[in-house]
Amino acid sequence: MGKTQILWGIAPIGWRNDDIPEIGAGNTLQHLLSDIVVAGFQGTEVGGFFPEPAILNKELELRNLRIAGKWFSSYIIRDGIEEAAKEFAAHCQYLKDVHADVAVVSEQTYSVQGLDKNVFKEKPYFTDEEWQRLFEGLNHLGEIAGRYGLKLVYHHHLGTGVQTEEEVDRLMAGTDPALVHLLYDTGHAYISDGNYMNILEKHIDRIRHVHFKDARLKIMEKCKREGNSFQQAFLQGMFTVPGDGCIDFREVYQTLLKHGYSGWIVVEAEQDPDVANPLEYALIARKYIDRHLLNVPATN
């Protein structure tokens, strides 16, 4: 991958949540971006409440911040490639206009992440024919992303058809490495499979974007016992920032360095901002990164 250059970002989801818009509704764009500067991060991802590019770019330039990417919910299996491609092209135009690097894609056909269903036991599964449609569709979206100077990075996610290590393996095997890359998310890997290193080590050559999401073990176990939905689980505090949960990010970070990873590492943790003050938790993450990751020599 060439010389390692890592950019550190933090996602807006700690301030406001796209799935539950009333959460953190009082946190303005200016408030969010200024908090990110105070916490010492270099950028963020686009939230659902972010404005048109001209307005956003002005706010970013005032604070010397950058945009890493933005989530795109694809429905390739449900709606077909042509419909998904049309929506994705508009998505990529926005990302190009805000000078982003990646387009984050997650196939949402049959997803339960926004439903009142047990996210631990009621995830969807694709048929062989649906997998093939997904492969073809993602390759096509990857071509579109490239035309806009972007990389398509696929987000494995709880409650979707591409969640488990086995499903990530299948996605990587079935798609073109030049067109479809991987967003590696520590929290989703850990909660899904109880292991966050396997996906990283197996697919390091496909990883072009990283989310550092931590998990609170006791709350996760409680949510599993209660059969919580995805939204119920994060509102109870299942997710948190690095340094406040049970994931050892030192091993993850050293592996990324060893393989010459270049790109964004974005801290991301769905939490209720009325319970977990966004700036406070951004600073917890920043302190952990500075003390336990950046001040440790790289291992061979």
From Swiss-Prot:
Q: Does the keyword Protein transport apply?
A: no
Q: Name one GO molecular function term.
A: myo-inosose-2 dehydratase activity
The pathway is:
Polyol metabolism; myo-inositol degradation into acetyl-CoA; acetyl-CoA from myo-inositol: step 2/7
EC number(s) in its UniProt entry? 4.2.1.44
Statement: the UniProt record of this protein carries the keyword Lyase: yes
Q: Which cofactor does it need?
A: glutathione; Co(2+); Mn(2+)
Q: Which reaction does it catalyse?
A: scyllo-inosose = 3D-3,5/4-trihydroxycyclohexane-1,2-dione + H2O
Q: What class of enzyme is it?
A: lyase
One record GO biological process: inositol catabolic process
One matching Pfam family is AP_endonuc_2
Q: Which UniProt keywords apply?
A: Cobalt, Lyase, Manganese
As for family, the record states: Belongs to the IolE/MocC family.
Matching PANTHER family, A to Z? Answer: HYDROXYPYRUVATE ISOMERASE, INOSOSE DEHYDRATASE
What's the name of the protein?
Inosose dehydratase
Species of the source: Bacillus licheniformis (strain ATCC 14580 / DSM 13 / JCM 2505 / CCUG 7422 / NBRC 12200 / NCIMB 9375 / NCTC 10341 / NRRL NRS-1264 / Gibson 46)
Record lineage: Bacteria, Bacillati, Bacillota, Bacilli, Bacillales
